[in-house]
């Protein structure tokens, strides 16, 4: 096991890049090896004040979410867990962690449960990003975090004995039939996703450079082309319910929805599933800038699916403030940047119409 201490130096760079004040809250993450692929993360509040943050998609989340990135020979190992979108207001207590200044908490997890490490060998582990800060159960800001770089030698035989967190469903056992009001709601959401994505693709390729800079931190033609291409791919994928690269469930077939989660994606299988909150708490479309709705939530999840456009996105940040503070390279691969940009590019929505041919399997 080899540990490279980079956290303090890189956190200083992150704080500078995000233009945070010197006393801004910051989390330091120390990764250590417990046994083979079992890892412990020690998260410390190195700021001067108590902080409350959303720990979904972060350490202390019990779901098989992406807590760290794994690399073998500088190539990232595919993540086989879930990426989910959650509420940004009205959060429940079980989604929040409060940490006093100088305090720590620990989280142990097995990286082999959400990645194929059966070939063994040297694996490098690290993580960085921003975690949403919460005030009165609402996302109110962001806290940057960064870990050390941990290098471990994986015993292939031991890694092969670790149960996979997600067991793929056989198509014959899908019980979540999309019918009734939920089928109607998802059909409307997909139509709206097509319109949003097409409008966003046009804005990305030939719209205001200042506005593109606002969301993606650059105006380079290569980035504008890449963003536009992803939006076009999403519009294509969402244009039908009969076939395509993704399978879209009206309800959760895996049991990972909870009182805060709107929807999630299983990128390794190009599966998307909606949760109850998608239908009960979200409007079909919002006319409020940067607010959540069904269409941009579906769009957010489509960006995660590599079958739609590769590579799929990550969840480096949530919400406008945090997402627009990312570096250009992270913004390009952050799901919420696409949802926020699309939300701020209102198209002229067509009247309801039957979905056209061939892309998304809706079940």
Swiss-Prot record:
Residues that, per the record, bind Zn(2+): 300, 304, 315
Pro-peptide region(s): 20-172
SUPFAM superfamilies found in the cross-reference section: Metalloproteases ('zincins'), catalytic domain
Cofactor: Zn(2+)
Top-rank EC class of the record's enzyme: hydrolase
Keyword Membrane assigned: no
Record's cofactor remark: Binds 1 zinc ion per subunit.
Main subcellular location of this protein, as a coarse class: secreted
InterPro entries registered for this protein in UniProt: Fungal_M35_metalloproteases, MetalloPept_cat_dom_sf, Peptidase_M35
A Gene Ontology molecular function term of the record: metalloendopeptidase activity
Any single GO CC term annotated in Swiss-Prot or TrEMBL for this entry: extracellular region
Taxonomy, superkingdom: Eukaryota
Enzyme nomenclature, EC number: 3.4.24.39
Signal sequence, renumbered to the chain: 1-19
Location(s) in or outside the cell: Secreted
SS bond partners: 178-250, 257-275
Protein family membership: Belongs to the peptidase M35 family.
PANTHER family: NEUTRAL PROTEASE 2-RELATED (PTHR37016:SF3), PTHR37016
Function noted in UniProt: Secreted metalloproteinase that allows assimilation of proteinaceous substrates. Shows high activities on basic nuclear substrates such as histone and protamine.
Protein's name in the database: Neutral protease 2 homolog NFIA_102630
Organism of this sequence: Neosartorya fischeri (strain ATCC 1020 / DSM 3700 / CBS 544.65 / FGSC A1164 / JCM 1740 / NRRL 181 / WB 181) (Aspergillus fischerianus)
